UniProtKB/Swiss-Prot annotation:
It is found in: Cell membrane; Cytoplasm. Interacts (via C-terminus) with BRI1 (via kinase domain). Negative regulator of brassinosteroid signaling. When associated to the membrane, limits the interaction of BRI1 with BAK1 by binding to the kinase-inactive form of BRI1. Residues 26-38, 288-310 have a biased composition (Low complexity). InterPro entries: BKI1/MAKR1/3/4. Its main location: membrane. GO terms for biological process: brassinosteroid mediated signaling pathway; lipid metabolic process; negative regulation of brassinosteroid biosynthetic process. Residues 1-38, 51-72, 270-310 are annotated as: Disordered. GO terms for molecular function: protein heterodimerization activity; protein kinase inhibitor activity. This is BRI1 kinase inhibitor 1.
Length: 337
């Protein structure tokens, strides 16, 4: 069993060296796997009859000394062991029955990511030549330049899109949006005008209210003056001479009812000339201004009623006094004659 395992390893090495002579400059994954310790590999051998996958692999394993031409004339379904990355991954053998259906592609470079499984940069041995370092650096620089080119292309496309915006076609939806915007602008303007008009209207209303108050105050003062004039108290002083020579005076326009009735009949109201010429007893009416200087407390209803009655009585007494004085003058003229 051990001899069979060694034969498998030797055949894979010789086959890879013959088919890929260009990979000698750069360390291949197979060399790295071969240089790795043997405990990384695990093989399972079964004593069952050969399967389809083992049948395909058997010609390569039984005749390791054959040339590359003989390997090329083998069954097309056989697995090509030349690219070791397709068989070994991180030092472990992959199942061959899955790889038998995959198309085999010749490997041109070890740094490409599209050719199946590859070893990472960490697994490369330190004994590699300077050419490999140069190749990796060139690949990194190429990737960075490609990324920069992609960024510049994206920026240029974005600028072109911004510059060449498609002109919107005329549609009813556009009209509706335009109308809505126009109406909103009109509403804003109206609101601003209303805000400006409100303080003006408030000022006008305030001024009108002030003017009306002033008018009412003036009118109130006038009404108070007329009320005072109407409710002012009057004092009258007059003297009446009875038939017996008794004088009866009227103060504040008050006479007895009997005296007034007698005066109407002509029984009263006889006085000498000396008394007639005196200002106190001449019968002249004198209005006292006490009522004009009185306070507003005299404007009650009871005082107004009493003053009206006094005025009426005073007027009647004045009329009677005039009649009596004229009758007395006539009598004097008759006596003198």
């Amino acid at each position: 069993m051990e001899t069979n395992l060694q034969q498998v390893k030797n055949s894979s090495q010789t086959f890879s060296e013959k088919q890929n002579p260009k990979q000698e400059a750069s360390p291949s994954p197979i060399s790295s796997t071969c240089s790795s310790p043997s405990h990384d590999f695990s093989f399972t051998i079964s004593l069952q009859p050969l399967s389809s996958s083992s049948k395909h692999i058997s010609p390569t394993l039984r005749s390791p000394s054959k040339t590359t031409s003989s390997y090329q004339q083998t069954d097309p379904f056989a697995v090509d062991l030349s690219p070791a990355d397709e068989i070994f991954f991180h030092g472990h053998l992959l199942p061959l029955h899955l790889l038998s259906h995959l198309p085999v592609s010749p490997r041109t470079s070890t740094g490409s990511y599209n050719d199946g499984f590859t070893l990472p940069v960490k697994d490369i041995l330190p004994d590699q030549p300077t050419n490999n370092n140069n190749n990796t650096e060139n690949a990194i620089t190429n990737i960075s330049t490609e990324a920069k080119d992609d960024n510049t292309e994206d920026k240029a496309e974005g600028e072109i899109r911004v510059k060449t915006k498609p002109i919107k076609s005329f549609s009813l939806f556009g009209l509706s949006k335009w109308r809505k915007g126009f109406e909103s602008n009109e509403r804003e303007q109206e609101q601003q005008q209303q805000k400006i008009k409100k303080p003006m209207s408030l000022d006008l209303s305030h001024a009108v209210k002030k003017y009306i108050r002033m008018l009412f105050q003036k009118r109130g003062n006038g009404t108070q003056f007329w009320n005072r004039r109407q409710t002012s108290s009057y004092s009258f002083s007059s003297s009446l001479m009875g038939p017996n020579g008794n004088s009866k005076t009227m103060i504040n326009g008050s006479y007895n009812k009997r005296d007034l009735i007698r005066g109407r009949r002509g029984e009263l109201f006889s006085a000498p000339a000396s008394m007639r010429t005196s200002p106190t007893n001449s019968g002249h009416l004198r209005v006292s201004t006490a009522g004009l200087s009185s306070s507003s407390g005299s404007t009650s209803s009871s005082s107004s009623d009493s003053t009206m009655e006094e005025l009426q009585a005073a007027i009647q007494a004045a009329i009677a006094h005039c009649k009596n004085s004229s009758a007395v003058d006539r009598d004097d003229k008759v006596k003198d004659s």
